[in-house]
Amino acid sequence: HSQGMFTNDFSKYLEEEHAKEFVEWLKNGKS
């Protein structure tokens, strides 16, 4: 169970990081 929870938290972390990068990319692309 702890392995699954770790994977779930990690995937959430990756999604958040990817979202930040995407926002920065959009800002740089639009300006």
Swiss-Prot record:
One Pfam family, short name please?
A: Hormone_2
The protein's role, per its UniProt record? Glucagon plays a key role in glucose metabolism and homeostasis. Regulates blood glucose by increasing gluconeogenesis and decreasing glycolysis.
Q: Which domain of life is it from?
A: Eukaryota
Q: Does the keyword Secreted apply?
A: yes
InterPro entries referenced in this protein's UniProt entry, alphabetically: Glucagon_GIP_secretin_VIP
Recorded family membership: Belongs to the glucagon family.
Its keywords, alphabetically, are: Hormone, Secreted
Localization, UniProt? Secreted
Q: What does induction of this protein depend on?
A: Produced in the A cells of the islets of Langerhans in response to a drop in blood sugar concentration.
Question: Where are the membrane-spanning stretches?
Answer: none
Its GO CC terms are:
extracellular region
This protein is called: Glucagon-3
Give the molecular function GO annotations.
hormone activity
